[in-house]
Amino acid sequence: MESKMSEKKKFGFVVLHYCTLDMTKKCIAAIQEKMAQADYEIVVVDNASGNGTGKDLAECYKDTEHVSVLLSKENLGFAKGNNLGYVYAREDLHCDFICVMNNDVILLQDNFAQLVEAAYEAHQFAVMGPHIE
């Protein structure tokens, strides 16, 4: 019997943004680099940045594959801002795995997709967290 994991899974990355344009761009670039061989989507949620950086991100990535920028009209805070992106990744983009991260996180793992898929195959987790040093 063939494993369900043999199908290519779609990864979603929800990145919460507030005012720090360069940091968010570095986060996005790292995901793009490390996930280039995987099926992935990046959902940037601008939490009503007062300095216009949300609109700057939307303009910068408007023609970029795999990147969506959601502009919240109000600052939803950490949990609701992430939930906005999570629901979009799950319901609109149909992501199988969703990684919620702050914009100061830089993805370093070259085989991130393979590690997550292997862990899921072994443990069928609903929530997984990183090892932080």
Give the role of each language-model region.
Residues 15-26, 48:
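Active-site beta-to-alpha loop of glycosyltransferases that engages the nucleotide-sugar donor
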Residues 106-133:
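Conserved donor NDP-sugar-binding/catalytic core segment of glycosyltransferases
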Residues 10-12, 41:
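Cell-envelope/extracellular polymer assembly enzymes that use nucleotide-activated donors
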Residues 30-39:
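Short, acidic, metal-binding catalytic loop of nucleotide-sugar glycosyltransferases
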Residues 94-106:
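Short beta-strand-to-loop acidic/aromatic patch adjacent to the donor-nucleotide binding site
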